Regions:
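Gram-negative/organellar outer-membrane beta-barrel architecture
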Residues: 157, 274, 294-417
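C-terminal motif of bacterial Sec signal peptides marking the signal peptidase cleavage site
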Residues: 4-7
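Interaction-mediating elements
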Residues: 9-307, 316, 327
Length: 417
C-alpha cells in the first residue's frame, strides 16, 4: 500500500489549478546526425533544463510522498517535522518552469558547441495533474575550425604566448567548442605561470572567432587583451626568500630582534626560538635567489612543507620586491604543531581462540627531535588476555613491551621536464 501511495497519490495534495512538474524532454531534429550523437545531445539538454523535478527512485517519488503525508507540522520537532523537513521534498510545480528562459539556455549551450544557427522551441504537455516541458532543437550545421593563428607582438609576453602554439588544443578540422577554448586559455596560463608570469590569468587571453570565412568554418586568433595590466606582462624572478618557522596566527604583527635573523644561503630565517636548523629548508623550498618564478616550484614547496607533519598552518605570500620591480620576494609563514605530545590509549579485544582482554598504551612523540623536523616516537604498552572458555579456561596471557622509532623527512627530487 505504501508503494502504491508513493507512486500514485502525490498529485491529490495539489491545490486547484496546480500541476506537478515531472521533467523535461529534448528532441534533436537533425536527420544528418547519428542516432548515438542525437541521444547524447538530448540527454545533455535535458540535464540543463531548470528546475529539476522531484527525485525519483524506481519510478516513484518517495521524498515528495514523505513531504505530503507529513502535512504541516505544528511544532519544530517530532516525527512530522522530521519527515517534512529532513526526509521530504517540496513539490516542484509546473508554474515554476520558465519555458522561454530554458529555451534560451539550451540555444546558448549548443551555440557554444559550434551550432551557430541553432534554434530551440519550447512547448509543454499536460497529463492529468502532471505536466512536462518539451524542447525541440534544430541545430543546423556545426562549424569546424579552419585555421588557428597565434600572432606574436614585439613584447616578451606576446612571444611567450605565440610559442604556446606547439601544443595547442585548438586543431584545424575539429568542431568549434567554447569549453575547449576555455581549457586552451588555462593551458596557456599554466605555461606562463611556469615562466615567471605570476600575475597573469586566463582572462587576459582573447580568442577571436571569425565565422565569415564560409563553408561552416571558423578562423581562430589567440592574442593578449589590450587591457592586460602591466604587472601581468612581467616575467618575475625571485629576490628575497624569508621564512618564519615559528609564526603565530594569533597576531597580525611580527616582532623580532636583529639576533633572531639568520642568513642561510639564499634564505633569510627569522626564528626567535631557534626551533629548526636552517638547512632543513634547503631540501624543501625549491626557489633560489635569481630563479624565474615557476608555479610548479611554488606548489611543490608548499606540498613539502605540509607533508613534513611538523606545521599546523602553512602560509605563503609573494610580493613585488622593494629593490626591483621585476622581482618577487617570497615569504613563508609556518605555524608549528606542539613539539611534544603524550597520548593514552585503552583497547578492549577478543579473538577466535576465546581470549578476551585489554591493553593500555602510552605514546610519546617529539616532532622536531634534533631540530631537523625528525619525528621521534616511543610507546610503552601492557595488556592481559584471559581465556574465558575451552580446555584452558582461566589461562592468562600477559604482554608488555616498548616500541621506539625515529623518522627523518625525506623528499624525492622531482624530474624537471
Amino acid at each position: 500500500a505504501l508503494v502504491f501511495l508513493a507512486g500514485c497519490s502525490n498529485t491529490k495534495y495539489l491545490e486547484e489549478g496546480e500541476l506537478l512538474y515531472i521533467g523535461a524532454k529534448a528532441k534533436v531534429a537533425d536527420s544528418a546526425m547519428s542516432r548515438k550523437d542525437r541521444k547524447a545531445l538530448e540527454d545533455e539538454l535535458e540535464g540543463l533544463a531548470r528546475p529539476k523535478p522531484n527525485s525519483k527512485i524506481l519510478g516513484m517519488r518517495p521524498k515528495l510522498w514523505a513531504y505530503n503525508i507529513a502535512g504541516e507540522p505544528k511544532k519544530e520537532r517530532g516525527l512530522r517535522h522530521w519527515l517534512r523537513n529532513k526526509v521530504g521534498e517540496e513539490p516542484v510545480l509546473f508554474s515554476q518552469v520558465d519555458l522561454e528562459y530554458n529555451a534560451n539556455v539550451l540555444e546558448s549551450y549548443v551555440e557554444n558547441r559550434g551550432y551557430f544557427k541553432a534554434k530551440v522551441s519550447a512547448d509543454s504537455t499536460r497529463r492529468g495533474k502532471k505536466a512536462f516541458a518539451e524542447y525541440t532543437l534544430k541545430p543546423g550545421p556545426r562549424y569546424h575550425i579552419r585555421e588557428v593563428e597565434f600572432p606574436a607582438d614585439s613584447s616578451a609576453l606576446g612571444e611567450a604566448v605565440a610559442r604556446a602554439n606547439r601544443r595547442t588544443l585548438l586543431k584545424p578540422g575539429a568542431p568549434y567548442d567554447l569549453e575547449v577554448i576555455k581549457t586552451e586559455r588555462e593551458r596557456i596560463d599554466s605555461r606562463l605561470k611556469r615562466r615567471g608570469y605570476y600575475y597573469f590569468n586566463p582572462d587576459y587571453i582573447l580568442v577571436q572567432v571569425d565565422s565569415t570565412v564560409g563553408k561552416n568554418q571558423v578562423d581562430l586568433k589567440v592574442k593578449i587583451k589590450a587591457e592586460t595590466p602591466a604587472q601581468a606582462r612581467i616575467a618575475y624572478t625571485i629576490a628575497d626568500i624569508v621564512v618564519y618557522p615559528n609564526f603565530s596566527i594569533k597576531t597580525d604583527t611580527i616582532n623580532y630582534k636583529p639576533e633572531d635573523v639568520k642568513q642561510h644561503g639564499d634564505f633569510t630565517i627569522i626564528d626567535s626560538s631557534k626551533l629548526f636548523k636552517p638547512r632543513i629548508f634547503d631540501r624543501i623550498l625549491q626557489f633560489q635567489r635569481g630563479d624565474v618564478y615557476n608555479r610548479n616550484d611554488h606548489n611543490l614547496s608548499l606540498q613539502r612543507l605540509i607533508n613534513m607533519g611538523t606545521f599546523q598552518f602553512v602560509k605563503n605570500e609573494f610580493r613585488i620586491s622593494d629593490s626591483l620591480s621585476t622581482a618577487l620576494d617570497a615569504f613563508y609563514y609556518l605555524t608549528p604543531l606542539p613539539r611534544k605530545s603524550l597520548r593514552f590509549e585503552v583497547l578492549g579485544k577478543t579473538n577466535s581462540a576465546n581470549f578476551t582482554g585489554s591493553e593500555l598504551s602510552i605514546n610519546w612523540s617529539n616532532r622536531n627531535f634534533f631540530r631537523g623536523a625528525e619525528l621521534f616516537t616511543t610507546s610503552l604498552f601492557g595488556g592481559i588476555e584471559v581465556q574465558v572458555s575451552g580446555r584452558n579456561k582461566g589461562f592468562n596471557v600477559y604482554r608488555i613491551g616498548n616500541e621506539t622509532s625515529l623518522t627523518w623527512p625525506r623528499f624525492i627530487t622531482p624530474i624537471r621536464i
